[in-house]
Curated annotation (Swiss-Prot):
It comes from Mus musculus (Mouse). It holds the Pfam family bZIP_2. The gene is Cebpb. Residues 22-104 are annotated as: Required for MYC transcriptional repression. This is CCAAT/enhancer-binding protein beta. SUPFAM superfamilies: Leucine zipper domain (SSF57959). InterPro entries: bZIP (IPR004827), bZIP_sf (IPR046347), C/EBP (IPR031106), C/EBP_chordates (IPR016468). It is found in: Nucleus; Cytoplasm.
């Protein structure tokens, strides 16, 4: 961690035109912000500037070459290269003439690292370009014809590599994906599935049925054939006799039920006649007799 002491103006970017530096409680990093270790030699003290508006740790800088890079300048013999900027010039001005030891290779970014030859001599070199991740290609899992099988077999090693990149288990069966996220692409089918896919999608012509068993030639004049026919005839006659018996029993049952129904109907008619006779008798009796009979 840096120490909050004083910030060197050489490490600051050029301020805008309407910007005035803020000095609150004098919290600046000390001038050794470009030091390579914790015990680096501090920069030599500078003479105070003539103008009273500039602070102790600041100095007057001519911004005209940087604000107008295309304008001709009398102080510069040739225009500065494109890769040089304001901070790089300040860095070269402050530390270019002083001999320094080889900086220690720490984890944080070293502002004056001697090994970074490709980066411009600025306080903060640009970060290296990020490596591009190449995603494996995926082929559509559509069913192909049987004549495309040689082409599929030719491209099988690449499909297998892409498949192994997304399959969690290196088995022949289709395993689970490496991540459960729904944004990850589906895995390539396994070799067994790829071989079985054409057969599942295109069944092709139906397989020829197995050759029927050759019919055994039977000699109708043989005793075995005659015995079989006789047994079949006996079984047919028995079944017919049973059917006739069931029909006769059903007819007999129907006749019995019909006779019972007629008998009951006759009984109902007789009772109806008796009821009507009794009603007529009660109508012919006198009322006083009926009243006395009711009290009894």
């Amino acid at each position: 961690m840096h120490r909050l002491l004083a910030w060197d103006a050489a490490c600051l970017p050029p301020p805008p035109a309407a910007f005035r530096p803020m000095e609150v409680a004098n919290f600046y990093y000390e001038p050794d912000c470009l030091a390579y270790g914790a015990k680096a030699a501090r920069a030599a003290p500078r003479a105070p500037a003539a103008e009273p508006a500039i602070g102790e740790h600041e100095r007057a800088i001519d911004f005209s070459p940087y604000l107008e890079p295309l304008a001709p300048a009398a102080d510069f013999a040739a225009p500065a290269p494109a890769h040089h900027d304001f901070l790089s010039d300040l860095f070269a001005d402050d530390y270019g003439a002083k001999p320094s030891k080889k900086p220690a290779d720490y984890g944080y970014v070293s502002l004056g690292r001697a090994g970074a030859k490709a980066a411009p001599p600025a306080c903060f070199p640009p970060p290296p370009p990020a490596a591009l991740k190449a995603e494996p290609g995926f082929e559509p899992a559509d069913c192909k014809r049987a004549d495309d099988a040689p082409a599929m077999a030719a491209g099988f090693p690449f499909a297998l590599r892409a498949y192994l990149g997304y399959q969690a288990t290196p088995s022949g069966s289709s395993g689970s994906l490496s991540t459960s996220s729904s944004s990850s692409p589906p895995g390539t089918p396994s070799p067994a599935d790829a071989k079985a896919a054409p057969a599942a999608c295109f069944a092709g012509p139906p397989a020829a049925p197995a050759k029927a068993k050759a019919k055994k030639t039977v000699d109708k004049l043989s005793d075995e054939y005659k015995m079989r026919r006789e047994r079949n005839n006996i079984a047919v006659r028995k079944s017919r006799d049973k059917a006739k018996m069931r029909n006769l029993e059903t007819q007999h049952k129907v006749l019995e039920l019909t006779a019972e129904n007629e008998r009951l109907q006759k009984k109902v008619e007789q009772l109806s006649r008796e009821l009507s006779t009794l009603r007529n008798l009660f109508k012919q009796l006198p009322e006083p007799l009926l009243a006395s009979a009711g009290h009894c």
